[in-house]
From Swiss-Prot:
Subunit organization: May form a complex with MA_1821.
Protein name, as recorded: L-aspartate semialdehyde sulfurtransferase iron-sulfur subunit
GO BP terms in the entry: methionine biosynthetic process
Keyword Membrane listed: no
Entry note: cofactor: Binds 2 [4Fe-4S] cluster.
PANTHER family, sorted: ADENYLYLSULFATE REDUCTASE, BETA SUBUNIT (PTHR43687), L-ASPARTATE SEMIALDEHYDE SULFURTRANSFERASE IRON-SULFUR SUBUNIT (PTHR43687:SF6)
Biological or metabolic pathway of the protein: Amino-acid biosynthesis
Role summary: Required for O-acetylhomoserine sulfhydrylase (OAHS)-independent homocysteine (Hcy) biosynthesis. Together with MA_1821, catalyzes the condensation of sulfide with aspartate semialdehyde to generate homocysteine. May be involved in the reduction of the disulfide formed in MA_1821.
GO MF, one example: 4 iron, 4 sulfur cluster binding
Domain 4Fe-4S ferredoxin-type: 72-101, 102-130
Residues that bind [4Fe-4S] cluster 2: 91, 111, 114, 117
Origin species: Methanosarcina acetivorans (strain ATCC 35395 / DSM 2834 / JCM 12185 / C2A)
C-alpha cells in the first residue's frame, strides 16, 4: 500500500536539492503528484509506500523539511452542494465527476488535499478532513 504525504520546504532550505538528496540517499522513489515551489517556499504532495514512510520522513526532516501524512479526504456537504461542477474543472486528480444522471460523484481515494476545489466552490460545500 502507499500513502499520500505532504512535504513542506521552508524558505531557508528552498535553495537546497532536498528531494533529490533524499531519493539518492535512501533509494526510495517518490511519486510526486503536485509540486508548488518558488524562491520562498516549497510544497509537494507525493505517494510513498507505507513500509518506507518512516525512513523517507527521517531523511527529509534531517534536511529541514516538514512531512505530514495526508489521511483526511475531502468532505462534501450534500445539503450545501448545488452540483454546479466548479470542483470538476479545477481538480488535478479527477476526484469529481458527473454520473449518467448528472449527479456529482466524489472519489475520495484520489484526493491529494490540494484545496483547489475548496477555493473554487461557490457555496462552501467542500472541506478537508471532516
Amino acid at each position: 500500500m502507499s500513502m499520500k504525504i505532504k512535504i513542506c520546504i521552508p524558505t531557508e532550505r528552498i535553495q537546497n536539492p532536498i528531494i533529490s538528496e533524499t531519493i539518492v540517499e535512501t533509494g526510495i522513489l517518490l511519486n510526486i503528484m503536485v509540486a508548488n515551489i518558488d524562491s520562498t517556499y516549497g510544497e509537494l504532495i507525493a505517494d510513498v509506500k507505507d513500509s518506507r514512510f518512516a525512513r523517507i520522513k527521517k531523511a527529509l526532516e534531517s534536511r529541514g523539511a516538514i512531512v505530514a501524512i495526508l489521511d483526511r479526504p475531502i468532505h462534501r456537504d450534500e445539503e450545501e452542494c448545488v452540483e454546479c461542477g466548479a470542483c470538476i474543472s479545477v481538480c488535478p486528480m479527477n476526484v469529481y465527476s458527473f454520473d449518467e444522471t448528472w449527479s456529482l460523484c466524489v472519489d475520495e481515494k484520489k484526493c491529494i488535499q490540494c484545496g483547489m476545489c475548496i477555493k473554487m466552490c461557490p457555496h462552501g460545500a467542500l472541506k478537508l478532513g471532516e
